[in-house]
From Swiss-Prot:
Region forming the signal peptide: none
Organism expressing this protein natively: Xanthomonas oryzae pv. oryzae (strain MAFF 311018)
Family: Belongs to the UPF0149 family.
Single GO cellular component term: cytosol
SUPFAM superfamilies reported for this sequence: YgfB-like
Domain of life: Bacteria
Protein name in UniProt: UPF0149 protein XOO1028
NCBIfam families the UniProt entry points to: PRK04758.1
Coiled-coil residue windows: none
Classification via Gene3D superfamilies: YgfB uncharacterised protein family UPF0149, PF03695
Intrachain disulfide bonds: none
Length: 180
């Protein structure tokens, strides 16, 4: 299942008077789900820690974002994608969006996990690396082609790290529960 268009997510976000970008919303949602948070229609209220937050319109871009993200994270073919910015955006905008995504992921993960979950050694490293990325900024990159390649590699690392954490906190326990 494909993620909705970034612009559609941004537009619906503005209609709900949210100050978060599409990247931040997707990062928070992915963190929430990876930390074991429930897949529910009120996900925005949960990741924003705002019980007064209105749920996204059923079938709207934000609802599609939740549904597609859940499907991608559970896909055995590793079809998970990051929702950042529009294709063709400048390097600085893509870099900022990725680091914003990582910051929001950590927030959502912390809200869902509430306390330190039992992670594999690789999961611990992935979480620490995501925390380091969350502290970075686009100032660490310039417009060189090497930086464009480096950003693509970092995006791929983030994608794999998220799936690893989701595996540690959600898929692993679910599998162990089936065995018992």
């Amino acid at each position: 299942m494909d993620l909705p268009d970034v612009t559609a997510v941004q537009n619906e976000s503005r209609q709900l008077a949210l100050a978060s970008s599409a990247a931040e919303l997707h990062g928070g949602l992915c963190g929430w789900l990876s930390g074991g948070g429930a897949d529910s229609a009120d996900w925005l209220a949960r990741i924003l820690a705002d019980t007064g937050q209105v749920a996204p319109k059923q079938g709207g871009a934000l609802d599609q974002l939740r549904q597609a993200t859940v499907a991608q994270m559970e896909d055995r073919d590793f079809a998970f994608e990051l929702l950042l910015v529009e294709d063709g955006a400048p390097l600085a905008a893509r870099t900022d969006a990725l680091f914003d995504w990582c910051r929001a992921f950590l927030g959502g993960f912390g809200l869902a996990a509430q306390q330190r979950p039992a992670l594999s050694e690789e999961g611990e490293e992935a979480l620490q690396d995501l925390a380091r990325l969350a502290q970075a900024s686009s100032d660490d990159f310039d417009a060189a082609d090497e930086d464009d390649t480096a950003l693509a590699e970092i995006e791929e690392f983030v994608r794999v790290a998220v799936l690893l954490l989701h595996g540690d906190c959600v898929m692993g326990p679910r599998f162990r529960q089936r065995l018992n």
